[in-house]
Structure formats: structure tokens, C-alpha cells
Amino acid sequence: MSTLKLTLLQQPLVWLDAQANLRHFDMLLESIQQRDVIVLPEMFTTGFAMNAAENALPETEVIDWLRHWSVRTDALIGGSVALNTPDGAVNRFLLVQPDGTILRYDKRHLFRMAGEHHHYLAGKERKVVEWRGWRILPQVCYDLRFPVWSRNQQDYDLALYVANWPAARAKHWQTLLAARAIENQAYVAGCNRVGDDDNGHHYQGNSVILDALGEIQAQAEPGQAAQLDAELSLETLQAYRERFPAFHDTDKFLLL
């Protein structure tokens, strides 16, 4: 498939109330049709809380919920959630396909300014999922500030960033998303939440979908709940990469 229909759900989150959040997304997903990828924000069941894992749903329950909507919408669907594992709590990006195939990516870069590294385990493995002819890289919030993690090989066409990124640093969010698109010659989508959390942080969203030149393909109204839709062209992306093959001059390196 050369065209990918992408949807981002920029929404408020109820603090530490997974069932309320799932009911809210149920209402939204009920009306979504004919999309290929649907993305929810970071920690979409709880909000970005350091004790979210104490209130976490079992992973099987979250996967069953995502699978239900993946089948109903015939789309790859996902976002990140706080989960408990035998080794400890993780901030895990789950992407589920209609046939039940699951990709799990654990957030690599934990936000130490909130003490996330004291409550969650850092992911160790970068993941790419192939879906309908597209290669998709899942990333979570603070990962955005570390370009090496998304730069070491040209193995994806679309990077998905899910976040709880406060309004106080909105300029960084917008600038870094564009930088990741330009330097990696890939589509980049950032799905952020809106509203206020119980720690006093305000979120204005600024969810956006960018092409490989850093040009805006779709952008949500700041501070408003929104469904953001765009159609991405793999042929356009490949033509640009061939026309401007900067990756051939990239410095090669390995992640240790």
C-alpha cells in the first residue's frame, strides 16, 4: 500500500482512572472508519503518573481492548501504557494488528526530571513494525530529545511519537519533531494529550503530522480535543529520498 491513512487522537486523560479513559476512547473509536493506523497518547489509561503502575490494568486486558478496536477499524492501533512486568514497571508502547500480532516497545529514555527512572525500567531494544508496506518506528515522549536512538539506520518510513508533553515546553516539541523528520527523511507524527493533570501540568497538545521535509501535513488546534487525520504517500517519500539521497553520507555507528 503506497498510501497510509493515519489518525492521531489528541485527548484529555482522567488521572489514574483506566476505565474512564477507555470509555472515553471507546466513544471516539466508535465513529472511526477506513483508517490504517490509529494512535493514542502516552500513558493513555492513566496519565503520566509515577505511581501509574500501581493502578495499571493487566497487559492482557489492554491488548484485548486494543485488539477489539483493531478488528473493528481494520487498523493498526496503539499508544503507551504503564504496565507491571515480572522485572518491574514499564512505560510500554503497544501496537496491535487485527490478526492479533503485537509489537511491544518499552520507553528507552525515562524523564528523570519527574523521577520516571526511579519508578520504571528503561527499554533496551528499538523496534520497527511493518504494516501494509510501511515500516513504522514507535517512540515515547522523552525519546524525542535523543536523535541517536532514531538515527542509526534508515529502516523506517514513519516515526510515531506518543507523549504527555507539557505546554511549558511546547516549542521544543514542535522543533524536535520537525528535526527528526528532516534529518531522518521520514514522516513523523506526534500525538500529545491535552488538559491538566493532578501534578499541575498543563498540556496543549500541538499534535502534528509532518512529511520528510518537515512540512505540516495536519495539525491539531492547541488546547482542544481533536481527531487528526492525514494520508501519507510512500511513493512521494521514496521519490524525495532518491532525489535528495543525504543518507548515503551519514556517519555509520552502532548503539552500545
Swiss-Prot record:
<dbReference type="InterPro" id="IPR052737">
    <property type="entry name" value="Omega-amidase_YafV"/>
</dbReference>
<comment type="similarity">
    <text>Belongs to the carbon-nitrogen hydrolase superfamily. NIT1/NIT2 family.</text>
</comment>
<feature type="active site">
    <location>
        <position position="107"/>
    </location>
</feature>
<dbReference type="InterPro" id="IPR003010">
    <property type="entry name" value="C-N_Hydrolase"/>
</dbReference>
<dbReference type="GO" id="GO:0050152">
    <property type="term" value="F:omega-amidase activity"/>
</dbReference>
<dbReference type="InterPro" id="IPR001110">
    <property type="entry name" value="UPF0012_CS"/>
</dbReference>
<dbReference type="GO" id="GO:0106008">
    <property type="term" value="F:2-oxoglutaramate amidase activity"/>
</dbReference>
<feature type="domain" description="CN hydrolase">
    <location>
        <begin position="4"/>
        <end position="234"/>
    </location>
</feature>
<feature type="active site" description="Nucleophile">
    <location>
        <position position="141"/>
    </location>
</feature>
<comment type="function">
    <text>Hydrolyzes alpha-ketoglutaramate (a-KGM) to alpha-ketoglutarate (alpha-KG) and ammonia (specific activity 21 umol/min/mg), has very weak activity on L-glutamine, and no activity on deaminated glutathione (dGSH) or glutathione. May function as a metabolite repair enzyme.</text>
</comment>
<protein>
    <recommendedName>
        <fullName>Omega-amidase YafV</fullName>
        <ecNumber>3.5.1.3</ecNumber>
    </recommendedName>
</protein>
<dbReference type="InterPro" id="IPR036526">
    <property type="entry name" value="C-N_Hydrolase_sf"/>
</dbReference>
<feature type="active site" description="Proton acceptor">
    <location>
        <position position="42"/>
    </location>
</feature>
<dbReference type="Pfam" id="PF00795">
    <property type="entry name" value="CN_hydrolase"/>
</dbReference>
<keyword id="KW-0378">Hydrolase</keyword>
